[in-house]
Regions:
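Active-site-adjacent structural elements that line small-molecule/cofactor binding pockets in enzymes
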Residues: 1-325
Length: 325
């Protein structure tokens, strides 16, 4: 008992659910819709992205989101924020105080689960419980080949790595075995602030809805028309209810090209719309009505400077869907 009391707090296990953490509480609640932002800019300027994140925090955005893209794959041409997501979010954590910091998503099938357990718990601690870890199974063949992994087994690897990850967060000096490793007489530290880091499935992760509602804390999916998205949300809610797991939020990614004319009608684009702020407000209210809890907005593909579009959202849109704390 004395040894446990003398142990540094960051090495102690917690019984608190991840849903009590500040990042979660700011972003998710039943019946509520909040907004998130991808602060990535076309020029990749880090200081500019820090300024955008700070502006988003001040405006009342609930979260900022980044991606895990290990390699610059020639046939894809998208490198996200370029920096490793954990380094990137740690930098943003040091420059902010309340906004949630999320990944959408870490490629769990490629990650070593013990290293991921340490990095995610560390970011959780350094950010004061603001980290939200979206995870996915990955889809770029070049990355799997480069890391010596079989793309064909990424669904199974996802499940196994998620299991090891949770055991590493929640155990002390207890053996953990899996197909690619064994840990005995050792443990991963630091431990998370709560019993684990909030984990969100991004996409299907090549799993059933039942698996994801049982083993993750929520779901981030892709933009769909309102009818199709309601079908998906209702299916998710039904699975959560059947399994008795309580509230599991659903979020959506949305690319927007915000027109300067506030009354510009919505025009469909890849993964989103070109539209004015009034059409955007109408869309967001409809998304809230169908059961979505969070919308991750990307402005990087718009025609206006990101700062200008963000300022308009901050003045006219975010106040109707503010962060929850």
């Amino acid at each position: 008992m004395g040894a446990a009391r003398d142990m540094p707090e960051i090495m102690r296990l917690s019984d608190e659910p991840p849903t009590t953490l500040p990042g979660w509480q700011r972003t998710f609640a039943p019946g509520e819709l909040t907004l998130g932002l991808s602060p990535v800019t076309p020029d990749g300027d880090l200081e500019r992205q820090v300024a955008l994140t700070q502006a988003a925090e001040d405006a009342g955005f609930a979260a900022v989101w980044c991606r895990d893209i290990p390699l610059n794959v020639e046939t894809f041409g998208d490198v996200g924020q370029i920096h490793d997501p954990f380094m990137y979010l740690t930098w943003l954590a040091a420059k902010t105080s309340t906004i949630a910091l999320g990944t959408a998503a870490v490629v769990l099938s490629l990650a070593h689960p013990l290293l991921l357990a340490k990095r995610s718990a560390g970011l959780d601690r350094l950010s004061g419980g603001r980290f939200l870890m979206g995870v996915a199974s990955g889809d770029r063949p070049e990355e799997f080949a480069a890391f010596g992994m079989d793309k064909g087994t990424r669904g199974e690897d996802f499940r196994e790595n998620l299991s090891v990850l949770r055991k590493a967060w929640a155990s002390r000096m207890r053996p953990v075995k899996w197909s690619r490793g064994r840990m005995g007489g050792a443990e991963v530290v630091p431990k998370p602030t709560a019993a684990g880091v909030p984990v969100l499935a991004v996409g299907s992760c090549l799993q059933t809805t039942e698996f994801n509602t049982a083993h993750t804390d929520g779901w981030l999916t892709y933009h769909r028309n309102l009818h199709d998205q309601k079908v998906m949300v209702d299916r998710w809610r039904a699975s959560s209810e059947e399994q008795g797991v309580g509230f599991r939020p659903v979020g959506e990614s949305l690319w927007i090209d915000l027109a300067e004319d506030p009354d510009y009608p919505a025009e469909g684009r890849d993964f989103g719309f070109r539209l004015g702020r009034n059409a955007l407000l109408e869309l967001l209210h409809s998304q809230q009505d169908l059961g979505l809890n969070h919308i991750m907005i990307s402005l990087r593909h718009g025609n206006r400077p990101v700062e200008d579009a963000l300022a308009e959202l901050a003045e006219y849109v975010v106040p109707e869907f503010p962060a929850l704390r």
